[in-house]
Amino acid sequence: MSDSIQRQHRPVAGILFCVFALLGFAIQDSMIKSLSTRYPLLEVLCIRSAIVLGLLVLVGLSLHGPKILRGNQPRPLMLRGILAFFAFTSYYLALSRIPLADAAAVYMTAPLFVTLLSAVVLRERVGIHRWGAVIVGFTAVIIMLAPGSALFRPEAAIPLFSALCYAMIPIINRRIGMTEHALTMGIYTTFTYLSLIVLTATIIHLVPAPQNLNQTLAGLFQRWHGFTVPDLGLAFAASCLFSLALLGITQAYRIAIVSTVTPFEYSYLVWATLIGFLFFGDIPGLRTVIGGLAVVTCGCYIVLRERRLSRV
């Protein structure tokens, strides 16, 4: 480790920023889950994204001026927003139907997908130890989902697609992270995300809902209606919390090395389980607990293995 990195590396502070940021994300997700029971999901996400975009632009202009709005590589930045749209919209779609802890446990496969995509897309060398961790992790997901059995719920598999889309974002970050400011990336991503929500909602409102549509997808075809003042306040609070959590996780990776911070991202599963129990009365089943622990263990092993090989 170089002297400059050593001076910047503040592991305890980085871990604290990460853990509290993930708590913020978990609380925000519970707010979105609550709002989606009373309003169409796309309407909830549209309002939240508009507020987040406004906050990011305001902070960016205040700290850096108009130059923060100019991206050096607009196409990868827009692709990042498209992936975020599919990742987060599908995740919140699942949250509207399944417990927070169940969705989080499957979503924790994202680091496994990152390892897989690093080998396939970036042609990075992945050794037998990490391939083994990936295989064990996805086996744990199969145990959690129980496909082919009476316990299987199709909507429970949606976070797996969400994790795959989200895992592509770090791949793009590795390509553009050295040339783009974090706020620029956030602004472009949120703007693209918001634009796609508006476009999708417009198309859905022009096309009649198909008959016998899956109940989970049927929620996308609900007609929009105005928020009450208290719920608008809840949406604003969720947006502020999301923005703070985003800044927190960015700060965590800025002041501590990746291999120190990444394992603590799994604290989201703990927060999600606790919040799901306290606010929704959800108690995770044995399959979710065992499978979730296996996925977390495999993800942490991959990170520690990469650190040992001096890859991060």
What residue ranges belong to the model's regions?
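Helix-helix packing/entry segments at the starts of transmembrane helices
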Residues: 47, 104-109, 177-192, 243-277
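Membrane-interface interhelical linkers
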Residues: 1-20, 53-79, 195-236, 243-255, ...
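Hydrophobic/aromatic residues within transmembrane alpha-helices
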Residues: 35, 44, 94, 100, ...
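C-terminal transmembrane-helix exit sites in multi-pass transporters
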Residues: 110-132, 270-289
